[in-house]
Amino acid sequence: MKSRTVALSILFAALAVVIALISLSVGTTKLPIADVVEVLLGGGRRGTRLVVLELRLPRVATGLLVGIAFGVSGALLQTLSRNPLASPDIVGVNSGASAGAVAVIVLAGTGGGNISGAAAKVGIPLAAVLGGLIATLIVGALSVRRGVVDAGRVVLIGVGVAAAANSLVAWMLVIGDVNDAGRAAAWLAGSLNARAWSDAIPVLIAVVFLLPVAMMFNRDLSALVLGDDVASSLGVRVARIRLGLLVIATVLAAMATAGAGPIAFVALVAPQIAQRLTRMERPPLLTTAMLGALFVVLADLLARNGLQWLRVGPYELPVGVVTAACGAPYLLHLIGRQQKGR
């Protein structure tokens, strides 16, 4: 790993920690950062520990983990397809995962906007992964031309699959109980509000197991950037590696979606910025992971407190609104750059 890549990874990780500490300290009850650090080290007063450990830390931890998962998923998909627009929120993975999760929220709902503990802890993540895998399977199968994945078709077919999945979601919201549908609609905006440890733990498990596995294939990813024929000549088992990494990318995106909803554009923006800053031929996984974590916790800090700081009112925005506001212009920039390159 290049020294520049390592340095940027450390920088983004440090910035993410700083923003996380600030996020833990601000809110209705403002706390000195020193008190927050004391609580995290095992000390602090009982009331402070309650605010930090039970109310705020699950939200911040979920944001960090979701950012890592989305970032790595986007980096893998963009590398495998050799297309900077191939992120899970564009090619249909997030939409498929959302359809699966919403099915559990609406169909397993109690009518009061809540679902049973077992369905929430197990059903939503599993349904999200299943929905994401189905969407990926459809996009992958329809994007192959003459035995090779067509990078242009990936995005076009992905947009179509996403539209179909979003239509299914809309239908479930219409037929579902109004309280369950309202909960699902709020979740679909991409929000870290009221996150609990039960939301963070599944994403943590996915990141802890799958990120190291993905990083084991760094050399294979670099070879795949050169083309399938070159990668095969270098000894890479292209079909097997591509399938395995595609499954990893899908599971990471689906688990992140299950944990916080389909937070837009994190998987698109983080890999591209990391690639530009590191000057590599592809998005580096570790740097992208740290940048994704930084992006989400910073966006959540602004979503939670931005309107109050501007004296607009005591309102909180979904984090997906902030990431979309940042990511949409960058998407247009990427499309414009691709058009100029033709």
Segments (PLM) and residue ranges:
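Alpha-helical transmembrane segments in inner-membrane proteins
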Residues: 1-342
